[in-house]
Amino acid sequence: MEISIPDEGMTVADALNADAGPIVVYGQLFDDGQGLRLCSGLTRSLPPICVGEPLLVDGLALVGVALEDHEGTMWSTDAVVLEGVIDGDTLRDSRVR
């Protein structure tokens, strides 16, 4: 699924290589029961699959985020911009911008 690229933030790949600290990152949210992740993109399958290495997302309230749901998998149809604190492969204290 192609997403429009926001004007702000870094890619998931860049975030995974970033030094620890506050960041702004964009991608598509994805949860197949193994925890909420931010992906660079999603496949066009149903349900979709995360493309590339995902960024784990910890502490995000999904209020106001448009999500699709199929067979226990949830994903955002549009790109989301998140800010939080990067800690290795996890975005902590995250919120939607």
Sequence positions of predicted segments:
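OB-fold and OB-like single-stranded nucleic-acid-recognition modules
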Residues: 1-97
